[in-house]
C-alpha cells in the first residue's frame, strides 16, 4: 500500500473513531446530567389525553435512561381550560430553564414558542397544520425549535360527522360542540360535509364546562339525534360529563378518541393513541440525546381507530347498524 493511501485510510479511520467516541461520550453525559422536562397543556394535567401523554412519555424516557428522581425533573403547567393562562404558564416553564417543552395542541405550542428563545418544543396532538400556523417551515424540515406530531383534526371531525350519520341513519339533525379555538376552515369543511350527507349541523361554542349543559339543551331543543364533540385537548377529559348530559337528553355522541368511548361517549374515533403517546416520548429522548428539533420531521398518524360503546347505546335504546359495528376496532359490551 502506498504511504499516501495508508495515511488517508488511517486519517479517515481516526475521524470515524473520534466521531463515534464523541457521540458515545455525549450520550453518556446526557444520561448523567439532570434533564428538565416541561409539560404545557390547555386542559387538566391528569385528565384524558394530557394525563396519558405524561405517563407514557415518562415510561418511554425511563426505557431510554431518563428517570424521575435520578436524572429527570418534570414540570407540569395546566391551563385547566382557561386558554388565557397559557402564555404565563409557558413563561414559567421557560424561567424554570426546562430543556424541552411538550406542548399539547397548537395553542400551547404557540404560547411556548412566544415565551422561549430557542427551547426545543415537541408538539403533542397538534390539530392544526404547523406550517400554516407558522410553527414550522415544513413538515419534513421544521427549521426551528418546534417538531412533533400533527394530525389533520379538521378533516377528522368531518369523518366523525360521517360516522355519526352512518350510525344514526334516520337522524337528520346533529349538534356540534366546539371549543373557542374553532377555526373558520373547520366550520366550512363541516358545513360542506353536512350538505353532502343531507343533514343539518348546529354549532355551539363553549368557553368552559359550565356551558356544556346549555349547549346540550339547545341541541335537544333543535331536535338533534346526536352530538359531534370537536377534536380538542380542552374536551379530552370530559367524556363522562358528555355521556351524562347526552344520555339525559336522549342523544348519542361521537368523541375524539377511543378511550372517550370507554369513558361514556357512544362512539370514539381518532388516531391510534398508544403509538402517538410513545412517539411523543421518542421525540423528547432524541432531543435529550442531541438531536436538533429543526431536523426532526413532524409526523402524521398512519392509523385511526373506531370504538363503539353498546352499553351507552342500550341506555339510549339505540340499535347501531350491524355493518357499522363490523367496521369498529373495539366494541364495548
Where are the regions a protein language model picked out?
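Short hydrophobic alpha-helices and adjacent helix-cap/hinge residues
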Residues: 1-333
Amino acid at each position: 500500500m502506498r504511504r499516501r493511501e495508508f495515511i488517508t485510510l488511517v486519517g479517515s479511520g481516526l475521524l470515524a473513531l473520534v466521531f463515534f467516541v464523541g457521540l458515545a461520550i455525549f450520550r453518556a453525559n446526557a444520561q448523567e446530567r439532570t434533564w428538565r422536562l416541561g409539560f404545557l397543556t390547555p386542559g387538566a394535567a391528569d385528565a384524558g389525553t394530557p394525563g396519558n401523554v405524561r405517563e407514557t412519555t415518562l415510561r418511554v424516557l425511563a426505557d431510554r435512561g431518563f428517570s424521575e428522581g435520578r436524572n429527570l425533573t418534570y414540570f407540569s403547567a395546566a391551563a385547566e381550560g382557561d386558554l388565557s393562562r397559557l402564555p404565563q404558564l409557558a413563561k414559567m416553564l421557560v424561567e424554570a430553564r426546562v430543556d424541552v417543552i411538550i406542548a399539547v395542541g397548537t395553542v400551547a405550542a404557540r404560547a411556548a414558542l412566544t415565551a422561549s428563545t430557542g427551547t426545543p418544543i415537541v408538539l403533542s396532538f397538534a390539530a392544526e397544520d404547523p406550517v400554516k400556523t407558522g410553527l414550522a417551515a415544513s413538515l419534513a424540515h421544521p427549521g426551528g425549535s418546534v417538531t412533533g406530531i400533527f394530525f389533520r383534526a379538521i378533516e377528522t371531525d368531518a369523518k366523525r360527522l360521517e360516522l355519526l350519520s352512518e350510525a344514526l341513519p334516520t337522524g337528520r339533525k346533529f349538534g356540534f360542540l366546539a371549543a373557542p379555538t374553532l377555526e373558520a376552515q373547520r366550520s366550512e369543511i363541516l358545513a360542506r360535509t353536512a350538505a353532502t350527507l343531507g343533514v343539518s349541523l348546529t354549532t355551539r361554542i363553549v368557553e368552559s364546562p359550565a356551558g356544556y349543559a346549555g349547549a346540550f339543551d339547545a341541541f335537544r331543543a333543535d331536535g338533534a339525534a346526536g352530538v359531534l364533540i370537536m377534536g380538542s385537548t380542552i374536551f379530552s377529559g370530559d367524556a363522562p360529563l358528555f355521556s351524562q348530559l347526552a344520555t339525559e337528553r336522549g342523544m348519542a355522541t361521537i368523541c375524539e378518541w377511543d378511550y372517550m368511548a370507554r369513558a361514556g361517549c357512544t362512539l370514539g374515533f381518532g388516531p391510534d393513541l398508544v403509538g402517538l403517546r410513545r412517539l411523543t416520548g421518542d421525540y423528547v429522548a432524541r432531543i435529550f440525546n442531541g438531536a436538533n428539533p429543526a431536523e426532526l420531521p413532524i409526523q402524521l398518524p398512519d392509523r385511526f381507530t373506531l370504538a363503539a360503546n353498546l352499553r351507552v347505546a342500550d341506555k339510549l335504546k339505540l340499535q347501531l347498524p350491524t355493518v357499522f359495528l363490523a367496521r369498529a376496532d373495539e366494541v364495548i359490551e
